[in-house]
Amino acid sequence: MRIELATSPGSPERPNEDWASVALPASGQGGALIVLDGVTPPEGDYGCEHGVPWFTARLGGTLLELSVSQLDAPLTEVLATAIRRTADVHRNSCDLSHVRTPQATVVMARWGGPSQDVEHLVLSDSVLLLESPEGGVRAILDDRIDRLPRELLRTHESADRLRNAEGGFFTAAADPGVTVHAVAGRTPRERVRALAALTDGASRWVEMFEEGSWTQCLGVLRKEGAQGLIDRVRAVETAALERTTVIRWKLHDDAAVVFAEL
């Protein structure tokens, strides 16, 4: 088994709000990965005294512990429990009903021995890639936000009306009920040669800049590693800035990648 992990802040002046980790049981069989992309709130009050990095670390750590200690629980249940536990930690000090309370996108994967399935869960716009033994790559996506008309997301206020709301998009915040909206499933272990989890700061190599396909993206990870893909993203971002003086998107975003060959 080969596992690589890398993460990079979008700016040295701001804390990295992405979070990534992997757990490998002492038995030597199986494992779990968690990748979170913390949602950066606009300036102003968002009801919490802790902040997004605190939230992603709390939620991520709880997810990792539950993923390997509650093997019989489906990942949707693991996520619901982790959201509830994290909310309980600051329920008495923060306004968890605020629409901008700290929240994150989620990618989870868990695998056992050769006869067991690879389980997956994706909530919001991070991505999980599954590679078959033949080399085909399947992207597991929760594309709700991409299907929304751009004009509905043009302002923070209009996006807030769609956040964790029917007809909009969902993130892991304080309501464990959002887990019913996650994209979850199972794949026979024998049909998964490798997997990769990417926040949108890394997946923009494919989705925004169209530098390659998902299959080519996984090929970069295999040859150059997780940091190699992030380095490619940073190079493309810089080149894009040099070509134009008008940037309509965040130049550098936090990026996190986990790559695992099973």
Feature map (PLM): residue ranges:
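PP2C/PPM-type serine/threonine phosphatase catalytic domain
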Residues: M1-L262
